[in-house]
Amino acid sequence: MSAPRVSFVSLGCPKALVDSERIITRLRAEGYEIARKHDGADLVVVNTCGFLDSARDESLNAIGSALSENGRVIVTGCLGAEPDVIREKHPNVLAITGPQAYESVMAAVHEAAPPSHDPYIDLLPPQGVKLTPRHYAYLKISEGCNNRCTFCIIPALRGDLVSRPAADVLREAEKLAKAGVKELLVISQDTSAYGIDIKYQTSMFGDREVRAKFLDLSEELGKLGIWVRMHYVYPYPHVADVIPLMAEGKILPYLDIPFQHASPQVLKNMRRPAHGEKTLERIRGWRDVCPDLAIRSTFIVGFPGETDEDFEMLLDWLDEAKIDRAGCFKYEPVKGARSNDLGLEQVPQDVKEARWHRFMQRQQKISATQLAKKVGKRLPVLIDEAHGTSAKGRTKYDAPEIDGSVHIQSRRPMRAGDIVTVKIERADAYDLYGSAV
């Protein structure tokens, strides 16, 4: 009897990608083959995103394509928390489960296409089959979020903060490092809140106890001898405790912090945990300790009630903060978000567009200035793609997918996963260019 074949679609953020990796691990362990195409597979699993309307549309379209090409579809992920929305457009899906519902997904798969042999779960590592390149991996340390930002529905989709025991996280990280992973990208909904829900409980890792706390976890990960990059860090005061580890080279001098805005009134309406002036003070303090710290962030323009004065305050804040990398989103109402019920005046779409363009132009100049400081330096670069003597990679200041790249020429062939020293010869607003030395 041939093994059942499952095609898989993974949409959304890195947290959802980790969920997909875990499901695929279970499928592989139970003897299922992962098909590259929907056509010819026994069924299709679609891991959806449901955060923004554009993401919901993408998910619904992906479900429709899978139904058209295969006809037997199981839906999971964040949009799965709204089964009525899915059934209304696609009534013929086989089953719908919400996010992180691994057992429910497997039960639906078993019913639709029974496994060809008994499962041997121990044959595969608990961290799962990786969907990223072999040289980097996402390390998810918690699920859910305790914050109640008015524009966000993640707590409704994924629940409150649930931190993993520190020893579990570290065992997974250690296995990844031993398997040849060169870079770990630490992710969650709120990385700096790690352990709060379990009162920083300790667990045994090897011969010692480790606390489930942001600082302690960072210290332990820093002992692995590979790149460790922190994502989704809220700007709490205790983030300052981790900066010395970056200055010492234990973890990468990089913080991904979603500041979202700078106007006190807009931040209050968003229910964000920081004030623009306070974050500027914190950024200055962090850079005093670690001068080469790179900061990436995301912002929202056109939030209900945002005035011209609020927006100008944001631009002024950008000039002061000198954020290295920044993404910007035009606010769009999300079904179920409390920002819909604040009674604030909606910002016209043309105003949102104009503000977005002004934001991006301002940030482009700042990014270009920051990158120009790298010209003439010799920097270690992790190769992501290689084509003989030309390659593309990243410095310790850039995360995959969301930041810039280093375009490299070399006299000798390079391979993905290599770390090479590159002399930076020029820069633009997004990327660096140089030669391997």
UniProtKB/Swiss-Prot annotation:
Record field: catalytic activity: L-aspartate(89)-[ribosomal protein uS12]-hydrogen + (sulfur carrier)-SH + AH2 + 2 S-adenosyl-L-methionine = 3-methylsulfanyl-L-aspartate(89)-[ribosomal protein uS12]-hydrogen + (sulfur carrier)-H + 5'-deoxyadenosine + L-methionine + A + S-adenosyl-L-homocysteine + 2 H(+)
Single Gene Ontology BP annotation: tRNA modification
Domain MTTase N-terminal intervals: 4-114
EC numbers on record: 2.8.4.4
Annotated residues for binding of [4Fe-4S] cluster 2: 145, 149, 152
Record-linked InterPro entries: Elp3/MiaA/NifB-like_rSAM, Methylthiotransferase, Methylthiotransferase_CS, Methylthiotransferase_N, Methylthiotransferase_N_sf, NA-bd_OB-fold, Ribosomal_uS12_MeSTrfase_RimO, rSAM
GO molecular function, one term: metal ion binding
Domain Radical SAM core positions: 131-369
Transcription regulation listed as a keyword: no
Positions that bind [4Fe-4S] cluster 1: 13, 49, 78
Stored Pfam families: Radical_SAM, TRAM_2, UPF0004
UniProt KW keywords: 4Fe-4S, Cytoplasm, Iron, Iron-sulfur, Metal-binding, S-adenosyl-L-methionine, Transferase
Obligatory cofactor(s): [4Fe-4S] cluster
Chief location of this protein within or outside the cell: cytoplasm
GO CC terms, sorted: cytosol
Protein function: Catalyzes the methylthiolation of an aspartic acid residue of ribosomal protein uS12.
Family per record: Belongs to the methylthiotransferase family. RimO subfamily.
Protein name per UniProt: Ribosomal protein uS12 methylthiotransferase RimO
Originating species: Mesorhizobium japonicum (strain LMG 29417 / CECT 9101 / MAFF 303099) (Mesorhizobium loti (strain MAFF 303099))
Species lineage: Bacteria, Pseudomonadati, Pseudomonadota, Alphaproteobacteria, Hyphomicrobiales
Gene transcribed to yield this protein: rimO
